[in-house]
Every structure is written in structure tokens, then in C-alpha cells.
């Protein structure tokens, strides 16, 4: 289901889909519910952000030619390590350092991302997060979002 949503959005707008980036399940120390010392949390944030940046660069995302304005749709599929499904708001908070690292690799501010989180039912060993960036979203004249095709996608 997670793959269908980005592809459907791309097909409607005539936007090509970027390749996916797979990252490990975020550390429990990044959870807003975690009761850990601030230095431990800070270390987990730094490690996750750096790892996401390196992996995004290895995937070739740093060489993309992005427009100066517009928002990027960030499709995030969370594949939990167990059948116990986490809350999507908790997972977005745990994902934030990854999001920052991807933005660092792209050379943009992470506020340009429009997040589309999906907690998958499929269990994957050790858990995974699959990220796909699809289109450029800009505000339409009627106030609603619209997708624009861009040659980089």
C-alpha cells in the first residue's frame, strides 16, 4: 500500500518517482516517550542524522537539481520489527533526525518536506524505514496543494 500511494500521486501529476532510501528502525532513545539522559538522546540524534545524510548521499540524492521554492512530498513507510504497531506521531518524532540528515544531503531546509507517514503491517527483521521523495508541492491559487512536474524527478 505504501508504494501505491506515492506512485498514484506521481502518475496524476506526471512526476517521476525517485528511488527509495531504506534506513534502519530509529533508536528507542529518539522516542518522545523515552526517559533517557539528554546526552544519550543527543548522541542518538547526532548518529541518526549523520547516518541518514551519508546514506542519502550514497543513494545519489545529493546530486539532485531541486527548484529554489516548493515543497517536496516525503513518503515514509515504517516497517516495525514486531507486530506491535507504534503510533505514527511517535514514529515521526523518532524519524526527525533522519529527516534532517536527508535535508542536509539535499542541501535544503527540512521545512520544505511534506511528510506522509504510513505504519505498515508487514514485520521486517530489526525494522526498517523506507523513504521516497516524489513531487514538488506548491500552493494553488485556491489555497490547496498541487503537484508540479520537475525534470529532476
Curated annotation (Swiss-Prot):
GO terms of biological process kind: DNA recombination; DNA repair
Taxonomic source organism: Xylella fastidiosa (strain Temecula1 / ATCC 700964)
Gene3D superfamilies from the UniProt entry: Holliday junction resolvase RusA
UniProt superkingdom: Bacteria
Entry protein name: Uncharacterized protein PD_1345
An example molecular function term from Gene Ontology annotations: magnesium ion binding
Keywords annotated in UniProt: Endonuclease, Hydrolase, Nuclease
Record family assignment: Belongs to the RusA family.
Transmembrane intervals: none
InterPro entries: RusA-like_sf
Amino acid at each position: 500500500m505504501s508504494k501505491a500511494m506515492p506512485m498514484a500521486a506521481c502518475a496524476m501529476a506526471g512526476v517521476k518517482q525517485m528511488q527509495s532510501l531504506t534506513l534502519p528502525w530509529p533508536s528507542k532513545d529518539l522516542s518522545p516517550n523515552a526517559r533517557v539522559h539528554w546526552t544519550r538522546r543527543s548522541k542518538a540524534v547526532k548518529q541518526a542524522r549523520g547516518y541518514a545524510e551519508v546514506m542519502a548521499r550514497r543513494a545519489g540524492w545529493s546530486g539532485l537539481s531541486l527548484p529554489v521554492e516548493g515543497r517536496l512530498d516525503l513518503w515514509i513507510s515504517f516497517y516495525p520489527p514486531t507486530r506491535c504497531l507504534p503510533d505514527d506521531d511517535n514514529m515521526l518524532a523518532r524519524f526527525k533526525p533522519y529527516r534532517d540528515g536527508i535535508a542536509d544531503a539535499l542541501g535544503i531546509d527540512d521545512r520544505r518536506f511534506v511528510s506522509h507517514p504510513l505504519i505498515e503491517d508487514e514485520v521486517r527483521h530489526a525494522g526498517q524505514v523506507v523513504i521516497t521523495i516524489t513531487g514538488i508541492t506548491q500552493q494553488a491559487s485556491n489555497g490547496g496543494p498541487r503537484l508540479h512536474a520537475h525534470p529532476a524527478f
